[in-house]
C-alpha cells in the first residue's frame, strides 16, 4: 500500500507537539491557589488552581492531567511504533496509525474546545488540526485493505459489539442530560462551562460511527472493519484514561459516589478488554 508523506509529516509534528503539551500539563504544577466563583447558572465552582489547568474546575483540571499521562505513557509510544511500521508499508501499521490518530483527534478536539483558556491554546489548536487532517488522509488510504479481511472473521460478533458499545455510550450520556431536562437543571458535571464538548463528540460522531460500523458489518460490507478499527483503539485507550483520570480527581478532592466510580471503570474495563481482543483478531487476519 502507498504511504502518504503528508500523514507521516503531520504525525511526527504531532509527536513533538503532544510530547510538549502533555509534559507541561502533567508536570508543571505551580500552585497559584484555587478560588470559588459563581457560574452563569448561579452555582459555585472551585478552580483547580495548579499549573496549566489552574482556571479549570477540580474535576476537569485533574481529568486533563490524567489524559496527559495516558498520552505520554501509551498514545505517543503507540503512535511512534505505528508510524515506523507504516513507513515500511505494513498494513497493520496503517491500521494502528489510523486508530491512534483517531484517539489523539478525540483528545485534542476535547482539550482545544472545552478547557479554560491557557498558555498552550495555540498548541492545542495545532494538534487538533494536525490530527484531523492526518486521520482523514490515513483513513482514506485504508480503503484497499477492506478486501483483505477474510470470511473467517467473527463478523456478526464484532458487529453486535460495536452496536452494544454505541448504545451503551448513548445511554451513559443521555441519562444525565434527560434527567437534567426533566428536573429543569443542568447536568452535574457541566459545572461552570458553557456546554459539554465530550458529549457533543460522542453523541454526534462516536456513537453514530459505532452504529454505522455495526450495520455495515451485519450487511457484510467489509468497509465496516475500517470504520470500526479507529473506534476500537479509542475504546481500548479510554480504559486507562478513565482510570488515571479518576485517581487524580480523587486525589484533588473531587467527590464521587461508589456507583460513579465502579460503574464507568467496570464498564470500560469490560468493553476495553473486548476491544483489545477484537483489535488483535483484526490485525492477525491481515
Model-derived features: positions:
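Non-cytosolic membrane-interface motifs at loop->transmembrane helix junctions
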Residues: 116-128, 189, 254-264
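Alpha-helical transmembrane segments of multi-pass integral membrane proteins
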Residues: 10-21, 103-106, 125-143, 153-178, ...
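Alpha-helical transmembrane segments of multi-pass membrane proteins
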Residues: 16-33
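Interfacial helix-start motif at the membrane-water boundary
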Residues: 49-74
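Alpha-helical transmembrane segments in multipass membrane proteins, preferentially the mid-helix core
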Residues: 78-84, 135-144, 204-222, 276-279
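Membrane-interface helix-loop-helix junctions at boundaries between adjacent transmembrane segments
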Residues: 83-137, 150
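A loop-to-helix transmembrane entry motif
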Residues: 60-68, 186-209
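Membrane-interface transmembrane-helix boundary segments in multi-pass integral membrane proteins
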Residues: 195, 199, 240, 244, ...
